[in-house]
């Protein structure tokens, strides 16, 4: 009686069909030119992960409902990370292949999770990444202020690379803090390019049919009309910066609920906005936080002109270097030119401590005036137009 049942395709045929789809995405994204990646067989994956054994499960990374992460090793790598999707529904319209294609293009950059290879023989998509001693999901509440700033800079640098390193800009479009991993050194790494899209040459945007991402992080014209541009990522970075600064509880209190007091509306204070998990805030950190918040508001279009992602990354570097850490040195892996920044750093390092202190005082005074005006208008705006999620 089972004659009517649909016959399952052999694994080799499934892998062949998927390989053709992957090749199509590789050609579309990078003309077939990308960093070398390896095709793993199902047997190789099982052997590397002890057949997806419980002892190999990376609990720190496996809290979401989309993937399970496993540690492993093979003859070529002492440590690998294997990401296995729960079901193919996670990858809407074969976005698994887009993830592989874009990951292979950017895996040489320090702020992206490095892809080693993939396996097309399982029913669920499997990707293999370079492993380090420790990878863990970003929990902003556990991070000190200095680390939060560095995380924001890492992500802005990664997205600036996506926007500028290739003949056509690539837009990540579904950024959220859950797509960011930290390694043992606290370096932020972006992953999962399933919904990444490229902007055609000569164009500034592209329109998509499927809206992907977390609502709070989505620019209004993308959420309503499916318009994707570089500013889609800039908006998401601005929102991420606000989350890093305020923490989830404070952000929810400000954005989603009636404001606690009229005094808070008329005289907004940084210590009422900053995440209390960060503990005591110094004067230097207060100045940084104000500059950080103002930059985030530019990213989300609430203050001044929306910056490019390259400008966001540069400003985040400046906020850290000039107001806090005189020894900060730009990364050689950034796509933009840092010569001027390096020169400024050398000049500043040759000045006296008194001069630096004076500059900080002037900067703080300017930020105080600007901050008070901006915050009052920002809170009033959200009081009238609270977003419905």
UniProtKB/Swiss-Prot annotation:
Residues carrying Phosphotyrosine: 129, 222
Keyword ATP-binding: yes
Entry's family note: Belongs to the protein kinase superfamily. Ser/Thr protein kinase family.
InterPro entries: Kinase-like_dom_sf, Prot_kinase_dom, WAK-like
The entry's keywords: ATP-binding, Nucleotide-binding, Phosphoprotein, Plant defense, Receptor
One of the Pfam families matching this protein, by short name: Pkinase
Any single biological process term in GO: cell surface receptor signaling pathway
SMART domains the UniProt entry points to: S_TKc
Modified residues (Phosphothreonine): 214
Molecular function terms, GO-annotated: ATP binding; protein kinase activity
Domain remark in the UniProt entry: The protein kinase domain is predicted to be catalytically inactive.
Name by which UniProt lists this protein: Inactive serine/threonine-protein kinase ZRK12
Induction remarks: Induced by elevated temperature (e.g. at 25 degrees Celsius).
Limits of the Protein kinase domain: 41-342
Function as written in the Swiss-Prot or TrEMBL entry: Together with RPP13L4/ZAR1, involved in the regulation of the ambient temperature-sensitive intersection of growth and immune response in the absence of pathogens.
Binding site for ATP: 47-55, 84
Gene (UniProt): ZRK12
PROSITE patterns: PROTEIN_KINASE_DOM (PS50011)
Effect of deleting the gene: Slightly shortened inflorescence stem when grown at 25 degrees Celsius. The double mutant zed1-6 zrk12-1 exhibits short inflorescence stem and autoimmunity symptoms when grown at 25 degrees Celsius.
Organism expressing this protein natively: Arabidopsis thaliana
């Amino acid at each position: 009686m089972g004659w009517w049942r649909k016959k399952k395709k052999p694994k080799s045929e499934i892998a062949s069909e998927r390989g053709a789809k992957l090749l199509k995405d590789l050609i579309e994204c990078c003309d077939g030119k990308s960093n070398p990646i390896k095709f793993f067989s199902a047997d190789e994956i099982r052997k590397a992960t002890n057949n997806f054994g419980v002892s190999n499960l990376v609990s720190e990374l496996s809290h979401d409902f989309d993937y399970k992460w496993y540690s492993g090793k093979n003859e070529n790598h002492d440590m690998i990370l294997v990401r296995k999707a729960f079901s193919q529904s996670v990858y809407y319209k074969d976005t698994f292949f887009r993830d592989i294609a874009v990951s292979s293009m950017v895996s040489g950059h320090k702020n992206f999770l490095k892809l080693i290879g993939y396996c097309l023989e399982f029913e669920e998509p499997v990707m293999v990444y370079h492993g380090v001693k420790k990878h863990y999901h970003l929990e902003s509440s556990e991070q000190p202020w200095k680390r939060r700033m560095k995380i924001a800079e890492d992500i802005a640098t990664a997205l600036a690379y996506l926007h500028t390193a290739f003949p056509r800009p690539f837009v990540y479009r579904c950024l959220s803090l859950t797509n960011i991993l930290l390694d043992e050194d606290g370096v932020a790494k972006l992953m999962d390019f399933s919904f990444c899209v490229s902007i055609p040459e000569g164009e500034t945007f592209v329109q998509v049919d499927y809206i992907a991402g977390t609502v709070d992080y989505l620019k209004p014209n993308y959420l309503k009309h499916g318009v994707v541009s570089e500013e889609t990522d800039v908006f998401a970075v601005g929102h991420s910066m606000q989350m890093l600064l305020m923490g989830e509880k404070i952000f929810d209190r400000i954005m989603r609920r009636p404001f606690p007091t009229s005094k808070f509306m008329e005289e907004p204070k940084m210590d009422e906005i900053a995440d209390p998990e960060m503990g005591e805030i110094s004067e230097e950190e207060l100045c940084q936080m104000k500059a950080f918040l103002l930059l985030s508001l530019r990213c989300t279009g609430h203050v001044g002109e929306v910056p490019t992602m390259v400008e966001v990354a540069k400003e985040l570097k400046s906020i850290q270097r000039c107001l806090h850490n005189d020894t900060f040195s730009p990364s050689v892996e950034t796509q933009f030119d840092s010569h001027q920044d390096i020169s400024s750093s050398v000049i500043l390092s040759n000045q006296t401590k008194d001069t630096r202190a004076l500059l900080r005082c002037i900067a703080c005074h300017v930020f105080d005036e600007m901050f008070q005006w901006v915050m009052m208008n920002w809170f009033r705006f959200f009081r009238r137009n609270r977003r419905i999620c």
